[in-house]
Amino acid sequence: MILFDVGAHHGQNSLDITQHNPNVICYAFEPTPELARLLRIAAEARGMKDRYHVYEHAISDFDGEADFHMVEGDTGSASLNEFADNLSETWPGRTDFAVRGSKKVNVYRLDTWLTIFASEITCIDHLHIDAQGSDLAVLKGLGDKLSMVQSGVVEVPQEDNLRLYKGQHTKQEALDFLEQNGFVNDKITSQVNEDNLYFVRKT
């Protein structure tokens, strides 16, 4: 089973799954250098260095370099995208949503990345995306290789006016894209201002 974890953060959505399922091979993408380092340490400590591969790349719908915005508190909010201007209204009290600096990172479309780094992969069994405002861009960046994806999850704002980042996709845009490309949204889980859309390929 091939698992992709785009925006792996601390590995909360992939380390345990990979450890407890010896048939899983995970490709984790995390552009924050310190988090990527900790993921590699965790994978080695759990004895799965050969099945848990960490790439310090950002994933989107273009290839090249871009500014990756680092944040003060919540490292899970670091993003290629800038924060929206109305966060004091839509996310009251979240003073940790403050950029502390930016660094240039390598950005890949997933179809390009697969061709360069893992051309042997022909099926992605599960694609977990938490790319902080770029989730739909990650899917679009698969191009024709989107047909390889069997299931996955993307994060979306619950309402258009609750977008955390400038230019972020809407929930409806994500739902429309999934339907147009042969997926069914089979579950939604919610957290503050955001929903996780789980999807599977139509049979």
Per-range role (PLM):
Residues M1-T203:
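Phosphate/nucleotide-binding beta-alpha loop and adjacent structural elements of enzyme active sites
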